[in-house]
Amino acid sequence: MTASELFEIAQEHRRNKRFGDAINMYRAVAEAEDATEQLKKQCIASIELIQEINSFVNVDLLNP
């Protein structure tokens, strides 16, 4: 599969809220030999965004 095809699969996983699978696919795209620099940057930014979303904690909900 080409980097572009893998990127589309990663985007589909992200849209379906399958963040773990999306991160794995984004990493595969970033490591692909045929990936452009722009595509690699998009993948890295997407991974960082997903990790930021997953690490969000609303501290107001933790107060008794």
Regions found by a protein language model. Name each.
Residues A45-P64:
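Alpha-helical linker/edge segments of TPR/alpha-solenoid repeat scaffolds
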